[in-house]
Amino acid sequence: MSKAMSCEPTPWRATVLTLFPEMFPGPLGVSLAGRALATGLWALEVRDIRDSATDKHRSVDDTPAGGGPGMVLRADVLAAAIDAADAGETRPRLVMSPRGRPLTQAKVAELAAGPGPLIVCGRFEGIDQRVIDARDLEEVSIGDYVLSGGEIAALALLDACVRLLPGVMGKQGSALEESFSDGLLEYPQYTRPQLFEERPIPEILTSGDHAKVAAWRRAEAEKLTRARRPDLFATRPQPNRQKPPKNTTDG
């Protein structure tokens, strides 16, 4: 049985294959993503992998070839689930895995600009490598740690994508100024009260000088990135240096 959320037609649709469909939409059903889902800005289809099992016990896993602990998700069952969900479609096919390529903001933007991905959520000891190869699944990781399954990772990926879809965020500028949007971590944020436990808001932020505020934010973002993510700082894109406009009053 598949569970579709939002029956409105939409150009961006995510399909999730999981053994625990009740985990969705989860946090994607509230706040920005939830409102966008309810109004048809995106669609979420959740399909139970067990629906593709062929025996009376709805078995989806078996012991690892060569021995070892745990169980492995079967290639035949998962392939059938993928084929049923993606018949005739061409779109990204992802599997959440700690051995995958790290998810970056650039990858998120790429996925958000496309038709929407199919995401496989693994469980147990892993997935039979043959279905990863045969169905051209791209392994994606959200960090160097191991979760109980791919569902939480899929939720994180989808949340990151959905907020970039047109009409989801109130101000597109918010997305443009966030961490990683230009290869830097985001600058510190402040709001009222003006003084908190003898700690004031930096004076420059209340000066009204937009150029100085922008320069301060850029400098703070660079300082934070250099200290916390030197790897990111070393590979950040360099800002375009625009030439000053030619003085047309000169001869």
From Swiss-Prot:
Single Gene Ontology MF annotation? tRNA (guanine(37)-N1)-methyltransferase activity
Gene Ontology, cellular component aspect: cytosol
The record ties this protein, via CDD domains, to:
TrmD-like
**Entry's InterPro entries?**
Alpha/beta_knot_MTases (IPR029028), tRNA_m1G_MeTrfase_C_sf (IPR023148), tRNA_m1G_MeTrfase_TrmD (IPR002649), tRNA_m1G_MTases_N (IPR029026), tRNA_MeTrfase_TRMD/TRM10 (IPR016009)
**Biological process GO annotation list?**
tRNA N1-guanine methylation
What parts of the sequence cross the membrane? none
Q: Where is the composition biased (Polar residues)?
A: 237-251
- What is annotated about its quaternary structure and interactions? Homodimer.
What function does this protein fulfil? Specifically methylates guanosine-37 in various tRNAs.
Q: This chain belongs to which protein, by name?
A: tRNA (guanine-N(1)-)-methyltransferase
Gene name as annotated:
trmD
